[in-house]
């Protein structure tokens, strides 16, 4: 991507841009969905005139997402949605390519808020955003609460995560949501791939890089058995751990039980767990009473979204002392004489202690994000929707929380198959008539659960 460096940015070290560029080029080959979108929609410039404020982990994979948005005509500003998840060479490369980015690994909470606000005022000629691309809801909340005037000409927002989607639905119920929102998280090619298969690989990567501990034979407690929890349980079991699942939902608990996992409350298993992983998106999953029960050098980490799943504040206030072993690895001495090892300060372990999900699975997620941004920006563009019939059902949007249509979900899946050498079977006309579906899809009803 060739353009002048951004004049308004803040990254850790701009000299890392060349390193970041090499990594971006390597990832592009592993992100066929985004490359397909650039090739198919690029000539039409469907995001020309869009001003997208993005708040999402500033990684190499996100750099490919950003450059895809730019290739489609958008002006973009960026911040990270997590204080530890930025890859500094990725941020440098994006700044050097001309995108105002405000992100570095190891931000303070104050710096994190500063970065999000700075991006809002970094568009050319002092213009305001007209689209939001969010991960977790912090940017959405900031604009709604502090800068509501920016929503007057905003086409809408797209949200990446389970946590952020929960906040959107709550905001809608409370009458506080002011623009249309697309729930990217619940696209099948996001939740069933990023959340499950992505976490299945990146959780263990984070734990291993942080601790070098052998997982085989250990008791691992996985809090939550949604898609993220399923992926984590599979990964730990595959490494030889004895996995115990905690759940509030009887359906998820039953799924865990018939998958071969013991299901029990945290209060009952905290004393035997050697590795603890929270995946719920809820607060107070691991609290002081659990820390006090844990065996020596229990490893505690989170792969939900925010750091409130683990009561880190209690741990810091009540531990006798703490020793920083290495970045994002802290060993706390408890008053009972035992130690607890906390990873990534209770934030996302796969991004804080490793590099997050692989490029390929993020291509699935980010393809949905790009399609959502296109859909929002062109919701009233009848000519565009006639030219690209896959967008025929994407608008106009009312204020509310919407899903992308099944045809776009299938498009995302389809454009990743060649990379894996997978070939589809084609329905015959007779078969399609028998099933009552079009030969070219969509193949499943919206209520189908994959």
Swiss-Prot record:
A Gene Ontology molecular function term of the record: adenosylhomocysteinase activity
Metabolic or biological pathway: Amino-acid biosynthesis; L-homocysteine biosynthesis; L-homocysteine from S-adenosyl-L-homocysteine: step 1/1
Pfam families membership: AdoHcyase, AdoHcyase_NAD
Catalysed reaction equations from the record: S-adenosyl-L-homocysteine + H2O = L-homocysteine + adenosine
Cellular localization per UniProt: Cytoplasm
Binding of substrate, residues: 59, 135, 160, 190, 194
Keywords (A to Z) from UniProt: Cytoplasm, Hydrolase, NAD, One-carbon metabolism
UniProt key word Cytoplasm: yes
Superkingdom in the source lineage: Eukaryota
InterPro entries tied to this protein: Adenosylhomocyst_ase-like_sf, Adenosylhomocysteinase-like, Ado_hCys_hydrolase_NAD-bd, NAD(P)-bd_dom_sf, S-Ado-L-homoCys_hydrolase_CS
E.C. designation(s): 3.13.2.1
Described purpose of this protein according to its UniProt entry: Adenosylhomocysteine is a competitive inhibitor of S-adenosyl-L-methionine-dependent methyl transferase reactions; therefore adenosylhomocysteinase may play a key role in the control of methylations via regulation of the intracellular concentration of adenosylhomocysteine.
HAMAP family: AdoHcyase (MF_00563)
Protein name (Swiss-Prot/TrEMBL): Adenosylhomocysteinase
Species for this entry: Candida albicans (strain SC5314 / ATCC MYA-2876) (Yeast)
Lineage: Eukaryota, Fungi, Dikarya, Ascomycota, Saccharomycotina
Gene behind the chain: SAH1
């Amino acid at each position: 991507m060739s353009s002048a460096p951004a004049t308004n940015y803040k990254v850790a070290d701009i000299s890392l841009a060349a390193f970041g560029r090499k990594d971006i080029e390597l990832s592009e080959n592993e992100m066929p969905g985004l490359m397909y979108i650039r090739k198919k929609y690029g000539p039409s410039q469907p995001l020309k005139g869009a001003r997208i404020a993005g708040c999402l982990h500033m990684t190499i994979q996100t750099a490919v997402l950003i450059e895809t948005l730019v290739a489609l005509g958008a002006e973009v500003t960026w911040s990270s949605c997590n204080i530890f998840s930025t890859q500094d060479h990725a941020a440098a490369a994006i700044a050097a390519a001309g995108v105002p980015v405000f992100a570095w690994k190891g931000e303070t909470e104050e710096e994190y808020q500063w970065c999000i606000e700075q991006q809002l005022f970094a568009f050319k000629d002092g213009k305001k955003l007209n689209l939001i691309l969010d991960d977790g809801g912090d940017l959405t909340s900031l604009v709604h609460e502090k800068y509501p005037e920016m929503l007057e000409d905003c086409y809408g927002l797209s949200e990446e995560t389970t946590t952020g989607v929960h906040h959107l639905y709550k905001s809608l119920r409370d009458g506080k949501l002011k623009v249309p929102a697309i729930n990217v998280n619940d696209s099948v090619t996001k939740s069933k791939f990023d959340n499950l298969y992505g976490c299945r690989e990146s959780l263990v990567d984070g734990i291993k890089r942080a601790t070098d501990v052998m997982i085989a034979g250990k008791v691992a407690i996985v809090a939550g058995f949604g898609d993220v929890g399923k992926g984590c349980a599979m990964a730990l079991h595959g490494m030889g751990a004895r996995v115990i699942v905690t759940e509030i939902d009887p359906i998820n608990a039953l799924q865990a039980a018939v998958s071969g996992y013991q299901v029990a409350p945290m209060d009952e298993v905290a004393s035997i767990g050697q590795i603890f992983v929270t995946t719920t998106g809820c607060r107070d999953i691991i609290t002081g009473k659990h820390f006090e029960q844990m065996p020596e050098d229990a490893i505690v980490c989170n792969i939900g979204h925010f750091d409130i799943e683990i009561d880190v504040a209690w741990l810091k206030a009540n531990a006798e002392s703490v020793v920083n072993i290495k970045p994002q690895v802290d060993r706390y001495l408890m008053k009972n004489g035992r130690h607890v090892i906390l990873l990534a300060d209770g934030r996302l372990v796969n991004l804080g202690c490793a590099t997050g999900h692989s490029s390929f699975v993020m291509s699935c997620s980010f393809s949905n994000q790009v399609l959502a941004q296109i859909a929002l920006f062109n919701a009233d563009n009848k000519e565009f929707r006639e030219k690209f019939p896959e967008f025929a059902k994407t608008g106009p949007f009312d204020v509310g929380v919407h899903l992308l249509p099944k045809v776009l979900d299938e498009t995302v899946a389809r454009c990743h198959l060649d990379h894996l050498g997978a070939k589809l079977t084609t329905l015959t006309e007779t078969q399609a008539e028998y099933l009552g579906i079009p030969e070219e899809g969509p193949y499943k009803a919206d209520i189908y659960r994959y």
